[in-house]
């Protein structure tokens, strides 16, 4: 039979108009993309090693499921183990992120089921637990699907302040950072819209994507990243350059032209170069040039001389993903001075492998010293060493978010970089000591991986000192003492002691030597900070965030929000203010008549003209296709949920 389905995005009676429209059509006009949502996984697990705070679980489907699993694993006398006050049955939940690969870690949350006799998960260890999709089927109860992942590890709970009644709920739940391991690869699936569905069109779209994005296998053979599977579906693999910013990868793919010869492409690049000069159209023009590939690099470079930071930023970002470092200095400038662009600038810098870009990221690890001398021509700007007024008074502008963001970008780029290379502590977590200057900072993580970063490699605990690391380890020091005594007391075992210096890194190592876990170390550091034994501040998951205000002088129409890079995980449920980890003021600065970047439902930032009394209906037609298909859930990709999340 024959099909009358149209093979171009527009049906028109005039064949010339139809041909023209088809030539202008982009891949995004033909496709929708699935596989962006989270897969919710659940399981029933057993937490061991509790200090008498566990309990025998009540009869329930959860208990039956756990007993079957323990019997399958050959655990001797599982019922006696469940009755022990050192164990507790827990519900394990995780969210499998898009594009995860087999063996990749992800966060897991655990909680006690309603009615559990257990009172606290503090100090516990989650035994290996299978995680699968689960669904309630009428008449059959809860059924489990394929096993997608397994989870295990130390349980980290929130160490909030309050009495035992206030903390009761907090102690009944926790998370295992990086405790899940995926057993499957997740790829994206590109689906042709029904009206364009055909084998020929699927091959054409896959061919256009594959010519722009490809990789080399271990034999050095070039392979396209898009492969047609049926007359409607194309399997899409992420390009390594976009591994930590796949939302941008999808936006670029949508800008690829389906039919375009060399002459037409050259004309279009000239047009896009002009659009790149305007703040209203710079973002989309940069994406379109990036979609063309390396031939567009000269046009993007010309925009680096533009007077507007916004234009320079969009051009520099596109250049970075084209593996050109010409805009690296602009990205570093945006990361330090413009919080609305910071997350995107750091993600782009992390993709550049050249030495100058590495040095720029290293500089971002350090606070910025600005002139605070009234009347000096450099007042409010970085100190000029040759200026006598600058030397009179300096003000250190320090951002925990920027320092840790630069660290994460460097770690993603090269985790063996000698400036940030860490030390593996007892196969429990990684300890990094960084010479950064400024006020001392300790950064702790509750997401992705257990990690402690000391900004200031000679940080020492103040004495007198008396804190705990877990239930059995005490850390004490007398006033003015140069050493700290770490003691472990446990019923039925002889006491153990370690004497170390007051350096925080040495205290951490000594505590782990006596059996402290990562949650125990976090507890110790938080307690020491509350008692003012820590010389600086402690920040937890201080990653760059989206949804911030950016002011500019020119009018603009509404521009769709960018979905955030997945380089920096955050939480959908995190209601904390950015100010908690951001010491420097918003450098956006302009008058009330300027345009602002406002938060959107997708968690991104949109450029909005604050002077408009009401939105222009015409603006809706200019919204990019990606705005409606970044995430069907309407939230930031949920791996950005903090599994207190």
Task: Locate the predicted segments by residue.
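Low-complexity, intrinsically disordered segments with a bias for serine/threonine
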Residues: 7-10, 390, 626
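Structural detector for internal amphipathic alpha-helices that build alpha-solenoid repeat scaffolds
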Residues: 282-292, 302-305, 312-324, 330-333, ...
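Generic short amphipathic/hydrophobic targeting helices enriched at N-termini
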Residues: 7, 379-381, 392, 593, ...
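The −1 position to Zn-ligating cysteines in a subset of zinc-ribbon hairpins
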Residues: 370, 386
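Bacterial Sec signal peptide processing site at the extreme N-terminus
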Residues: 1-16, 20
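Amphipathic alpha-helical scaffolding segments comprising HEAT/armadillo-like alpha-solenoid repeats
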Residues: 262-274, 294-305, 324-336, 354-366, ...
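Beta-strand/loop-dominated core regions that host nucleotide or nucleotide-derived cofactor-binding catalytic loops
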Residues: 14-37, 42, 48-270, 276-281, ...
């Amino acid at each position: 039979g024959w099909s009358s389905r149209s093979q171009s995005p527009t049906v028109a009676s005039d064949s010339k108009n139809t041909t023209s429209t088809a030539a202008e059509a982009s891949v995004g006009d033909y496709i929708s993309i699935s596989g962006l949502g989270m897969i919710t996984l659940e399981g029933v697990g057993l937490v061991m090693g509790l200090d008498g705070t566990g309990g025998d679980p009540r009869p329930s489907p959860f208990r039956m499921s756990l007993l079957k699993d323990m019997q399958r694993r050959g655990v001797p006398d599982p019922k006696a183990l469940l009755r022990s006050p050192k164990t507790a049955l827990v519900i394990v939940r995780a969210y499998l992120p898009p594009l995860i690969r087999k063996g990749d870690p992800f966060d897991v949350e655990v909680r006690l089921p309603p009615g559990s006799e257990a009172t606290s998960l503090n100090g516990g260890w989650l035994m290996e637990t299978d995680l699968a999709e689960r669904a309630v089927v009428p008449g059959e109860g809860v059924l489990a699907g394929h096993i997608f992942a397994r989870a295990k590890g130390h349980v980290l709970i929130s160490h909030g302040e309050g009495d035992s009644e206030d903390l009761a709920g907090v102690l009944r739940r926790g998370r295992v950072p990086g405790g899940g391991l995926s057993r499957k690869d997740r790829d994206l699936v590109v689906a042709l819209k029904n009206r364009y569905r055909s084998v020929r069109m699927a091959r054409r779209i896959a061919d256009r994507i594959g010519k722009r994005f490809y990789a080399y296998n271990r034999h050095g053979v070039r392979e396209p990243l898009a492969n047609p599977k049926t007359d409607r579906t194309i399997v899409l693999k992420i390009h390594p350059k976009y591994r930590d910013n796949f939302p941008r990868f999808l936006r670029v793919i949508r800008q690829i032209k389906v039919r375009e010869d060399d002459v037409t492409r050259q004309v279009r690049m000239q047009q896009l170069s002009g659009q790149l000069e305007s703040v209203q159209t710079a973002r989309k023009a940069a994406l379109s040039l990036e979609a063309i590939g390396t031939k567009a690099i000269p046009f993007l470079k010309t925009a680096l001389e533009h007077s507007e930071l916004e234009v320079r930023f969009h051009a520099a970002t596109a250049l970075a993903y084209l593996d050109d470092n010409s805009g690296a200095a602009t990205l570093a400038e945006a990361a330090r001075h413009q919080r609305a662009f910071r997350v995107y600038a750091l993600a782009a810098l992390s993709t550049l492998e050249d030495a100058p870009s590495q040095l720029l990221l290293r500089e971002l690890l350090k606070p910025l010293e600005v002139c605070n001398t009234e009347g000096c021509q450099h007042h409010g700007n970085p100190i000029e060493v040759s200026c006598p007024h600058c030397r009179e008074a300096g003000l250190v502008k320090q951002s925990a978010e920027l320092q840790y963001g630069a660290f994460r970008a460097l770690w993603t780029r090269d985790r063996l970089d000698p400036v940030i290379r860490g030390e593996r502590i007892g196969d429990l977590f990684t300890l990094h000591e960084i010479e950064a200057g400024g006020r001392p900072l300790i950064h702790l993580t509750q997401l992705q991986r257990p990690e402690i970063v000391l900004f200031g490699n000679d940080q020492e605990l103040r004495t007198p000192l008396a804190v705990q690391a877990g239930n059995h380890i005490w850390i004490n020091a007398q006033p003015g003492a140069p050493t700290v005594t770490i003691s472990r007391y446990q019923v039925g075992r002889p006491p153990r002691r370690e004497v170390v210096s007051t350096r925080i890194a040495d205290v951490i190592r000594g505590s782990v030597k006596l059996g402290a876990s990562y949650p125990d170390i976090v507890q110790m550091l938080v307690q020491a900070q509350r008692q003012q034994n820590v010389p600086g501040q402690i920040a937890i998951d201080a990653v760059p965030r989206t949804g911030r205000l950016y002011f500019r002088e020119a009018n603009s129409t509404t521009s769709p929000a960018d979905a955030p890079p997945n380089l920096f995980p955050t939480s959908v449920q995190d209601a904390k203010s950015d100010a908690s980890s951001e010491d420097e003021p918003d450098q956006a600065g302009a008058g009330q008549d300027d345009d602002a970047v406002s938060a959107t439902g997708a968690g991104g930032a949109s450029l909005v003209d604050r002077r408009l009394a009401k939105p222009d209906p015409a603006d809706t037609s200019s919204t990019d296709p990606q705005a409606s298909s970044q995430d069907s859930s309407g939230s930031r990709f949920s791996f950005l949920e903090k599994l207190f999340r």
